[in-house]
């Protein structure tokens, strides 16, 4: 272990990262160092920061590099991600930091586009003034921006058509986007997002679009923030039933405490500048990966394979998860997210391999065993986040008096324990029995055997 890794390990031990099972060691050493430094200095949440960097790298890669998951199954590294937490948790600052280099890249492109349009419009006007109008005009400039924040579904599809390397839907309070989707597009955008995630072609025909849009290999990332109390709205909109939620990575820190501010150190500005510059260089290196299109405008993908060792490890991990699902007899107890996990995990492995290359720590010839193991660790961490969100939503859905009853009970309890606790909170024996049936039906508790129960949250 070199000095940087040793230093990072000691800092992670001090911060309680290992204790909270946060897989910060899945990242390259210089990224670990950056996350730890900015967490202490800027109060960035380590967990939000980890996730923000991943989706930023994924965005920078776009359709430039794909991964072969199995046989003919090839995938881009697209990720749908939502940072969840109470107000004041600091969800936005790490996201802004992670995407700052891509915003700078977009700003340069927009500036050049404006100049190109001025030149093009000037040529058009000059051509109008000529008697001989046979002189040809150059192609009209196209704006190939990456970050899309304020948009209609049609505008998003146009932006994706113009920039087939890929775009990211970046919305701070993301429930606003979902509400607008339901109000204006009758759910069409959600269907397009489901299609894009699966890597299937998008075809859009509208009266307002003179030439129909066909996108053979759509790449759309989604990233945003959401308050914990609004999570239930995603369920109510039917996004669990249609599978959208199964495709979203939710990031929910192990601690929901808002950190104190420390006093600024004299070197804080220069330290922030140092890491900001380093991150700029890393993202710009990823953006420099060539995205090649043939004469028909179709992408020629650079496809990375798993190494033989990585493929065996990944396949074994996936098979173990599926075997566990196959043991479940009740279809209602099957977690549909398990089926999507291999796709998301393979994409994370690709993102990590490219990030390690951009940091100067590894190659980009194939996805190795280290990137694969790290991706699995991250995937399992993110699923734990989702489980904790589910527990929160279950708890919030319980009526206040039943919640009081639960608070008086241990993790495992008997009917007699519940009746005694009911007396303490003013519930009759009959009310307690009805409450136990209701809580078990809603999967807040589980009946282990006659007269014995276990809390599921």
Predicted regions and their residues:
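Phosphate-handling catalytic cores of nucleic-acid transaction enzymes
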Residues: 1-457
């Amino acid at each position: 272990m070199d000095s940087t890794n040793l230093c990072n390990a000691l800092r992670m031990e001090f911060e309680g990262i290992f204790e909270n099972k946060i897989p910060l060691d899945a990242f390259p050493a210089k990224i670990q160092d950056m996350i730890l430094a900015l967490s202490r200095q800027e109060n960035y949440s380590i967990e939000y920061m980890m996730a923000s960097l991943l989706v930023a790298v994924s965005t920078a890669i776009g359709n430039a590099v794909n991964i072969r998951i199995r046989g003919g199954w090839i995938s881009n590294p697209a990720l749908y991600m939502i940072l969840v937490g109470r107000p004041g948790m600091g969800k936005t600052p790490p996201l802004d930091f992670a995407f700052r280099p891509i915003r700078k890249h977009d700003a340069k492109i927009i500036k050049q586009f404006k100049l190109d349009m001025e030149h093009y419009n000037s040529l058009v006007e000059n051509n109008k003034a000529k008697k001989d109008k046979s002189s040809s005009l150059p192609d009209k400039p196209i704006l190939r921006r990456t970050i899309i924040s304020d948009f209609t579904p049609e505008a998003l599809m146009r932006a994706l058509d113009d920039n087939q390397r890929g775009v990211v839907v970046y919305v701070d309070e993301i429930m606003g986007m979902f509400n607008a989707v339901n109000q204006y597009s009758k759910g069409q955008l959600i269907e397009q997002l489901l299609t894009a995630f699966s890597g299937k072609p998008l075809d859009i025909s509208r009266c307002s679009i003179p030439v129909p849009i066909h996108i053979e290999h759509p790449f759309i990332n989604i990233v945003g923030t959401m308050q914990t109390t609004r999570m239930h709205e995603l369920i109510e909109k039917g996004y669990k039933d249609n599978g959208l939620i199964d495709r979203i990575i939710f990031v929910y820190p192990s601690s929901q405490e808002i950190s104190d501010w420390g006093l600024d150190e004299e070197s804080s500005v220069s330290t922030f500048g140092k890491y900001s510059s380093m991150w700029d260089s890393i993202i710009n290196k990823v953006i420099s990966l060539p995205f090649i299109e043939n004469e028909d405008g179709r992408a020629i993908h650079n496809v990375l394979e798993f190494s033989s060792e990585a493929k065996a490890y990944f396949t074994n991990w996936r098979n173990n998860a599926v075997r566990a699902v196959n043991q479940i007899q009740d279809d209602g107890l099957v977690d549909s997210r398990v089926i999507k996990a291999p796709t998301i995990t393979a994409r994370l492995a690709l993102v990590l391999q490219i990030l390690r290359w951009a940091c100067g720590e590894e190659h980009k010839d194939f996805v190795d065993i280290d990137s694969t193991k790290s991706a699995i660790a991250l995937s399992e961490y993110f699923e734990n986040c989702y489980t904790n969100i589910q527990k929160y939503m279950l708890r919030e859905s319980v009526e206040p008096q039943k919640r009081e009853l639960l608070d008086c009970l241990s993790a495992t309890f008997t009917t007699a324990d519940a009746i005694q606790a009911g007396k303490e909170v003013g519930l009759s024996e009959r009310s307690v029995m009805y409450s136990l049936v209701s809580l078990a039906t809603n999967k807040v508790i589980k009946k282990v055997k006659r007269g014995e129960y276990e809390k599921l949250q």
